[in-house]
């Protein structure tokens, strides 16, 4: 593989100890990532996507690593979102909350507790699992069923697409921006409907 250490503004880890520690999640799978990235910004994430596209390498996101199905392991680039994307902003008297993918369910529920509220999804691993994984897997838990799962409780998302475009699905012009700047992604999403 080409030297990737100078290809982005973010230095990846390829240390053997890091590779081995990220080779496992809560599942029985063992996949050794080529590199581990811990971006701090959406722009750095876009750089990782660009490099992965250039090299034909897959990108896997990891936060809590609590899935029993192996979604948090990869033999490509592994992006750790737990270290730098932990933001929680409670608004509207706890009716809405804006959360970054690395925040744990427990941290979010602790922030909402003063309003006597909590998230809909209630996975058993709430102390370690993160919002990124909960949303990606549409996690629910024992109590929320299908009425309060992730998909039913999300108002909007801010996404960094593989082509580097950052899109806020809550913006009134999100559909037009996506159609204009990423027509193939837009067409693919329309085809899924």
Regions found by a protein language model. Give the residues of each.
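N-terminal flexible segment immediately upstream of the FAD-binding catalytic core
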Residues: 1-54, 64-95, 124, 147
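Residue-level detector of anion-binding/catalytic polar loops
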Residues: 57-58, 118
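Solvent-exposed beta-strand sheet faces enriched in polar/charged residues
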Residues: 60-62
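FAD-binding subdomain of flavoenzyme oxidoreductases
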Residues: 88-91, 100-101, 105-193
């Amino acid at each position: 593989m080409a030297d990737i250490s100078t290809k982005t503004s973010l230095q990846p880890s390829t240390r053997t100890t890091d590779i081995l520690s990220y080779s496992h999640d809560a599942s029985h799978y063992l996949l050794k990532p080529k590199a581990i990235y811990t971006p701090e910004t959406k722009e750095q994430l876009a750089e990782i996507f660009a490099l992965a596209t250039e090299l034909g390498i897959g990108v896997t996101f990891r936060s809590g690593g609590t899935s029993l199905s192996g979604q948090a392991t990869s033999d490509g680039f592994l992006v750790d979102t737990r270290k730098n994307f932990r933001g929680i902003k409670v608004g509207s008297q706890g009716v809405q909350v804006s959360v970054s993918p690395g925040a744990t369910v427990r941290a979010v529920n602790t922030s909402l507790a003063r309003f006597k509220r909590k998230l809909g999804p209630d996975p058993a691993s709430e102390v370690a699992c993160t919002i990124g994984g909960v949303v990606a897997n549409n996690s629910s838990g024992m109590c929320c069923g299908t009425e309060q799962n992730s998909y039913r409780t999300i108002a909007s998302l801010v996404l960094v697409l593989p082509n580097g475009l950052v899109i806020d699905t809550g913006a009134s012009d999100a559909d037009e921006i996506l159609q204009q700047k990423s027509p193939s992604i837009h067409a693919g999403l329309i085809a899924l409907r």
